[in-house]
Amino acid sequence: MKTYLVTGCAGFIGSNFVHYMLEKYQDIRLVNLDKLTYAGNLENLEDIKDDARHIFVKGDICDKALVTDLIAKYDPDYVINFAAESHVDRSIRNPEIFVESNVLGTVNLLQCCKDAWYDADAKTWKEGKKYLQVSTDEVYGALGAEGYFMETTPLCPHSPYSASKASADMFVKAFHDTYGMPINITRCSNNYGPYQFPEKLIPLLINNAKHHKTLPVYGDGMQIRDWLYVMDHCKAIDMVANGGKDGEVYNVGGHNERPNIFIVKTVIEQLHDRLKDEGISEELIKHVADRLGHARRYGIDPTKIKNDLGWYPETPFEKGIVLTIGWYLAHEEWMDHVTSGNYQKYYEQMYKNK
């Protein structure tokens, strides 16, 4: 039986990964360490709360004693780090939090793994161990109208969020180069799908449109992103963990580049047609001041992971957005719970005066 220590898996991508792995593998153990910040939600794991293969631990990846104890107790074969503050707008307001979670938290995980797995006298690592860092294409910066990010593209982050993720990636690489730690890094494009906190574009649009609230669009809305259905991403992480070449970075993209305004209009059209609600229309769109340092285009070339591991994105955007909207409409109680209280205060801070 393989054991995974997965961090941040009460959040969006992490909780989907837990569901994916439990469905795919019977003989598995997932130890899930999550601090349960605003975007970490135990309701994301409600349907597996009685599954003995999943062990939830509330705690911080910065807590050295806790991480050390978990590694000693469960002896994980893999440590996969999903834990991160991930919203660019929040990083612009409070960059210190991003340094603490994304940089210092990653360094603590790396050091704890090294302490447990590395024999300094023999200069050898325990067999079958690996650390995998889940990162983002935003570490590469911005693209022009043509071309794609490749694994060899220099890191050039533009926001405090992407700077924190790039720094974490460099520490992961440094532990590999300095100590020989077995590692991989995955860098993904924009994920969408179930369980995503509604500060992110697609669930925010769905929630606002249902309630006939304004749909805020940064600038002209022509910023282009590559959209990756979250379960395709989970499959890629599984394949990299179990088959990725030691020390390698793998880009994970969806081949689904779309301008943000296209996403907005697609969600409006889908909800209008599904709900037969004339109040859901493009009249809800409101262009607001553009985000500071907002990159115009991201695009990923996933050729390497396809050639090395056989992975490819199985879900075209046209299918994925239908699945995603259907999930949120079927889980209104989940949305109501996560958008209460502190979310309302945050939303007002971000958009009230724009």
Spell out what each predicted region is.
Residues 146, 157-164, 194, 198, ...:
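The catalytic Tyr-centered alpha-helix of NAD(P)H-dependent dehydrogenases
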Residues 121-123, 141-145, 180, 196, ...:
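Proline-centered turn/helix-capping motifs that create local helix->coil transitions or kinks
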Residues 41-44, 94, 145, 197-201, ...:
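Residues at alpha-helix caps and immediate loop-helix transition turns in enzyme cores, especially N-
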Residues 41, 145, 194-198, 256, ...:
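Residue-level signature of the cytosolic catalytic core of signaling kinases
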Residues 4, 17, 24, 30, ...:
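C-terminal substrate-binding subdomain of Rossmann-fold SDR/epimerase-dehydratase oxidoreductases
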Residues 66, 97, 104, 197-201, ...:
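Residue-level recognition of oxygen-bearing side chains
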